[in-house]
């Protein structure tokens, strides 16, 4: 009595879902605190024995889980209890909670099997509906296997409300339990002949999903689908049938010829835009070889494009993008409308128009379309502006710049892109500047000019997104300095004070490029001092006319400028900048004194000429493009064993792997001590090189012999390190003039020039495909099994259908009878062969697995429907 009174009191004072929502809107505790208190209250209420109290608590928990992501997996057993209630209101709340929270790993999943079976057999159609909806959402292999008989029964229900939901749940049952196809598929196909539009819509929807997964398995049902296409007047049913035929026509060309006329008829007569668009999409994607149908579809697309509704306009552009690969003339006919759509307010319309413009690009119109797009990029928002830039870059660089004839024009276009205010595609432009330099020799003079104009543009230094472009420009200026008209101005641009705005990694590239320029200028100067080789040196490089223009004063001035600019960087905080700066300053310290004293530089044995000649050799090797798959082609050397587990490091390193004691010296002290010991040892070895080797040397040699695979090659690189900012004045005032000439947006490509040679790789330049397909292997295997089951069911159905047809109609044509007898003879012969094989193989294996039987039956020839012949 006490427990009963307690449950009544709990139910009386329990807050309903409506009270919870009102309290949530008026709460002052904060959202998280209120939800925590509500969940604690629900945990207490859901333990009540009264199902009304329990169901109300479960209802509130479902609300919190749906809107606020509260975990409700802990209430799984309580949901099973509520479902078992005889009241429909409680049952509905329980099924909702199960649908919302159950998954394949739910521990109490098996407890609902009998309850779902009971509800599927209920006389109340609404309870049956709840069970079917739940099964369609959480159905597992076990549930599908155990409930297949009930689903089969409901497929023949006289209640339309129940039958359409049973048809919908069949798809989930087929996916989870493939043997259900043998039981339910025939009855599912029979529903294609129903006159009830709701049931027909449901069954066509199921076959639409099956055809998407595997069109081949649905091909024998083409006559039934064709009948629906011709007879149905329900637009949504027709749309689904069109989706089915769009898949089937791709694998059976004769089917396209058969369905083209009914589809065109629907396009002519219907006023429903949704049906017209689906007809258009079916024609342009699957019936593109039918010229009359394509022309009608393009005319309908034109009607979509001129609509004021942005949704219809987008659909028209989307249809044009589908038809573009095979019928580019359709896009060219609507070019003006597509260009006009670039200024539409809807971002989706603009994006689709951009994709269409890029589909039209070829070597004849790339300049015109690029000019149009650059104008739109200047006045577009940052997001769409960068989408335009990326599209142009992708189209122009496709297949090693196959549509670019005039690379001087294209490099100027890249410079123009860099100056667009919203440009954030610095890395893409950087890649193309370097890539063109490595691939196209004839483009290097213009590349150097564009790079110099980029370096002296002060606006680019303050934009973080454009720093990669400046990095590429600096590298190009140093790598191809022989094409520079004035190396002195290049050095000024590389060492200008505003380069302090750049990150250290790019600043290091600036310094290294200045080093390359200095080496080139000194090399040219020394070459010009040699009387026997001065004329030869002038002709050695077709791109450089600067061999004889360097004088003693200009070289000395250049050295002083670089020394002045890099001096402060010898104490720079970044180690790479510091190291590169000290490398250059060390080189200058070697050659400056000889140049300043005007020694006889005609003597090849001077220290300056020797060092310069060596550095020229270092920088003389040209870089070329490298395939993205080059690393994969490197063969592992014979005898090399890379152990996955480096467990033997303890044996090799010994005591060095022991943990450091807490009272030992610090890590920094150890490093300093080790470095000082190494220096002392080097000095001792230098002073006593003739003395006998120490015992440690022999031990080291023995250790290296035993564990040589863990040693690097012994090559010493003695380099200094340092760096910081420069206060050298800006480049000369002619920079703006020259940069404007380089980035003239009205400049057109010179079509009369022959296309320069572009270096291509033998295995292509495409990037390696990411292994995303591996994640879909299990899904593909499941779809394959389902496909085999459907094909087996269709073969059985077709055999019975053909037999009934020819036996029941003695007046059938002679050709059909011959075809039928041929198929039966073929099947009988196949059966005889299988029996013989089975007798021969009885000694080794007496039984064939069920999967092998399915594969054998699915591999039989699919009968092509007669209406295609």
Curated annotation (Swiss-Prot):
UniProt function note:
Part of the AP-3 complex, an adaptor-related complex which seems to be clathrin-associated. The complex is associated with the Golgi region as well as more peripheral structures. It facilitates the budding of vesicles from the Golgi membrane and may be directly involved in trafficking to the vacuole. It also function in maintaining the identity of lytic vacuoles and in regulating the transition between storage and lytic vacuoles.
Q: Which UniProt keywords apply?
A: Acetylation, Cytoplasm, Golgi apparatus, Membrane, Protein transport, Repeat, Transport
Annotated region (Disordered), positions in chain: 738-869
Q: Name one GO biological process term.
A: vesicle targeting
Provide the protein name.
Answer: AP-3 complex subunit delta
Primary place of residence? cytoplasm
Q: What happens when the gene is disrupted?
A: No obvious phenotype except defective lytic vacuoles with altered morphology and accumulation of proteins.
**Basic and acidic residues composition bias: residue spans:** 815-830
Q: Where is the composition biased (Basic residues)?
A: 831-850
Tell me the membrane topology, using the record's own terms: Peripheral membrane protein
Kindly give the Pfam families that the UniProt entry links to this protein.
Answer: Adaptin_N
A Gene Ontology CC term for this entry? Golgi apparatus
Which InterPro entries has this protein been placed in?
AP3_complex_dsu, ARM-like, ARM-type_fold, Clathrin/coatomer_adapt-like_N
Q: Where in the cell is it found?
A: Cytoplasm; Golgi apparatus membrane
Species assigned in the record? Arabidopsis thaliana
The text of the family note is: Belongs to the adaptor complexes large subunit family.
Tell me the residues on which N-acetylserine occurs: 2
């Amino acid at each position: 009595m006490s427990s009963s009174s307690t449950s009544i009191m709990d139910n009386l004072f329990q807050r309903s879902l409506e009270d919870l929502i009102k309290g949530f809107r008026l709460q002052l505790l904060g959202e998280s605190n209120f939800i925590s208190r509500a969940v604690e209250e629900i945990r207490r209420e859901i333990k009540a024995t009264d199902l009304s109290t329990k169901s109300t608590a479960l209802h509130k928990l479902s609300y919190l889980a749906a809107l606020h992501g509260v975990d409700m997996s802990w209430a799984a057993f309580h949901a099973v209890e509520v479902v078992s209630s005889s009241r429909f209101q409680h049952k509905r709340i329980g099924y909702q909670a199960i649908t919302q929270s159950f998954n394949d790993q739910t521990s109490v999943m098996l407890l609902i099997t009998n309850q779902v079976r009971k509800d599927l057999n209920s006389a109340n159609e609404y309870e049956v509906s709840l069970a079917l909806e739940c099964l369609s959402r959480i159905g597992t292999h076990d549930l599908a296997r155990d409930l297949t008989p009930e689903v089969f029964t409901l497929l023949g229900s006289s209640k339309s409300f129940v039958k359409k939901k049973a048809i919908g749940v069949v798809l989930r049952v087929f996916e989870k339990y493939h043997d259900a196809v043998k039981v339910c598929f025939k009855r599912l196909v029979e529903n294609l002949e129903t006159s009830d539009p709701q049931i027909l819509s449901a069954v066509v929807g199921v076959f639409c999903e099956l055809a998407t997964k595997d069109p081949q398995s649905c091909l024998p049902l083409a006559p039934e689908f064709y009948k629906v296409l011709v007879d149905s007047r329900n637009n949504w049913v027709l749309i689904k049938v069109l989706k089915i035929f769009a898949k089937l026509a791709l694998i059976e060309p004769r089917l396209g010829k058969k369905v083209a006329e009914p589809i065109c008829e629907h396009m002519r007569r219907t006023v429903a835009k949704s049906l017209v668009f689906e007809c258009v999409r079916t024609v342009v994607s699957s019936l593109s070889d039918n010229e009359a149908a394509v022309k009608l579809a393009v005319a309908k697309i034109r009607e979509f494009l001129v609509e004021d509704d942005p949704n219809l306009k987008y659909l028209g552009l989307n249809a044009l993008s589908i038809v573009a690969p095979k019928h580019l003339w359709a896009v060219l006919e609507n070019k003006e409308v597509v260009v006009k759509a670039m200024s539409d307010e809807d971002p989706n319309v603009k994006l689709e128009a951009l994709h269409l413009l890029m589909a039209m690009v070829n070597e004849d119109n790339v300049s015109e379309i690029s000019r149009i797009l650059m104008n739109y990029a200047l006045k577009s928002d940052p997001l769409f502006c960068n989408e335009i830039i990326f599209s142009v870059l992708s189209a122009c660089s496709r297949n090693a710049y196959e549509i670019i004839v005039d690379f001087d024009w294209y490099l100027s276009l890249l410079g123009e892109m860099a100056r667009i205010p919203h440009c954030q595609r610095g890395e893409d432009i950087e890649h193309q500047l370097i890539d063109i330099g490595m691939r196209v020799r004839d483009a290097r003079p213009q590349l150097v000019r564009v790079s110099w104009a980029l370096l002296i543009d002060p606006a680019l230094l303050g934009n973080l997104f454009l720093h990669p472009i400046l990095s590429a420009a600096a590298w190009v200026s140093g790598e191809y300095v022989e094409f520079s008209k004035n190396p002195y101005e290049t050095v000024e641009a590389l060492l200008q004070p505003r380069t302090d705005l750049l990150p250290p990694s790019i600043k290091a590239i600036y310094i290294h490029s200045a080093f390359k320029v200095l080496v080139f200028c000194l090399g040219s100067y020394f070459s010009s001092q040699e009387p026997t080789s001065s004329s030869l040196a002038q002709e050695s490089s077709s791109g450089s006319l600067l061999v004889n223009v360097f004088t003693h004063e200009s070289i000395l001035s250049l050295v002083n400028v670089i020394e002045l600019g890099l001096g402060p960087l010898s104490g720079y905080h970044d180690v790479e900048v510091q190291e590169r700066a000290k490398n250059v300053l060390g080189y200058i310290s070697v050659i400056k004194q000889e140049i300043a004293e005007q020694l006889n530089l005609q003597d090849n044995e001077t220290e300056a000429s020797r060092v310069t000649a060596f550095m020229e050799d270092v920088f003389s090797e040209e870089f070329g493009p490298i395939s993205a798959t080059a690393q994969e082609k490197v063969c592992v050397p014979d005898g090399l064993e890379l152990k996955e587990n480096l467990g033997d490091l303890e044996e090799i390193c010994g005591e060095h792997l022991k943990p450091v004691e807490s009272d030992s010296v610090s890590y920094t002290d150890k490093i300093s001590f080790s470095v000082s010991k190494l220096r002392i040892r080097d000095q001792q070895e230098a002073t006593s090189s003739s003395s006998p080797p120490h015992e440690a040397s022999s031990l080291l040699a023995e250790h290296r012999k035993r564990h040589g695979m863990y040693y690097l090659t012994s090559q010493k690189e003695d380099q200094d390190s340092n760096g910081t900012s420069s206060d050298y004045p800006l480049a000369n005032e002619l920079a703006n003039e020259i940069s404007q000439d380089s980035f003239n947006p009205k400049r057109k490509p010179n079509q009369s020039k022959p296309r320069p040679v572009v270096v291509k790789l033998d295995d292509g330049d495409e990037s390696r495909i990411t292994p995303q397909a591996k994640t879909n292997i299990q899904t593909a295997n499941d779809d394959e099994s389902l496909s085999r089951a459907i094909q087996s069911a269709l073969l059985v159905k077709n055999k019975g259908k053909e037999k009934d047809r020819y036996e029941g109609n003695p007046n059938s044509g002679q050709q059909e009878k011959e075809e039928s007898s041929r198929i039966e003879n073929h099947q009988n012969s196949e059966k005889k062969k299988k029996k013989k094989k089975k007798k021969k193989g009885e000694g080794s294996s007496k039984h064939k697995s069920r999967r092998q039987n399915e594969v054998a039956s699915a591999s039989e020839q699919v009968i092509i429907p007669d209406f295609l012949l």
